[in-house]
A protein has these predicted regions:
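Generic structural signal for residues in well-ordered beta-strands
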Residues: 26-28, 93, 125
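N-terminal beta1-alpha1 cap of cysteine-dependent amidohydrolase-like domains
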Residues: 1-71, 80
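Active-site oxyanion/phosphate-handling segment shared across diverse enzymes
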Residues: 119-126
C-alpha cells in the first residue's frame, strides 16, 4: 500500500489517479488526521507527501513522518511535500524571486544518476 498524505490541496487526487495507474492500493489521509504511530501500523510500502498551501512547518504530521520514517520508508514529496523533506534535512526554504506556480520552464540535468535514466535533457517541467 502507498500512503498519500494530503496537505489540503486538490492536486492530491491527481496524484492519486496517476499513482493508481501503477499501484494497486493507495490510501489517502489528511495531514492532521493521522499520527506517525498510526502510519507505522498501516505499514506502507512508500509515502507521498502532497502539495498544499503554506510552509513545511504548517504541513501537519509531514515533518515528523520524514524525521522518524524517512530512513525506513521511501518518501516522495511534491511541492510542499518536497519543501518539507528539504527543510527536515537542513535546507532553507525561501520565496522565489519570480512566481512560477503553474508555469513551465526548461531544466538541465547536470549529474548522471540512475534516477534520471531515460529522461531527455533539457526538458520542460512545471
Amino acid at each position: 500500500m502507498i500512503l498519500l498524505i494530503d496537505n489540503y490541496d486538490s492536486f492530491a487526487y491527481n496524484l492519486y489517479q496517476m499513482v493508481g495507474e501503477i499501484a494497486k492500493e493507495i490510501k489517502v489521509i489528511r495531514n492532521d488526521t493521522i499520527s506517525v504511530k498510526q502510519i507505522v501500523q498501516l505499514n506502507p510500502q512508500a509515502i507521498i507527501l502532497s502539495p498544499g498551501p503554506g510552509r513545511p512547518e504548517d504541513a501537519g504530521v509531514c515533518q515528523e513522518v520524514i524525521t522518524r520514517l524517512g530512513h525506513k520508508i521511501p518518501i516522495l514529496g511534491v511541492c510542499l511535500g518536497h519543501q518539507a523533506i528539504c527543510q527536515v534535512f537542513g535546507a532553507t526554504i525561501t520565496h522565489a524571486p519570480q512566481l512560477m506556480h503553474g508555469k513551465s520552464s526548461y531544466i538541465q540535468i547536470n549529474q548522471e544518476s540512475p534516477l534520471f535514466d531515460g529522461i531527455a535533457a533539457p526538458m520542460q517541467v512545471a
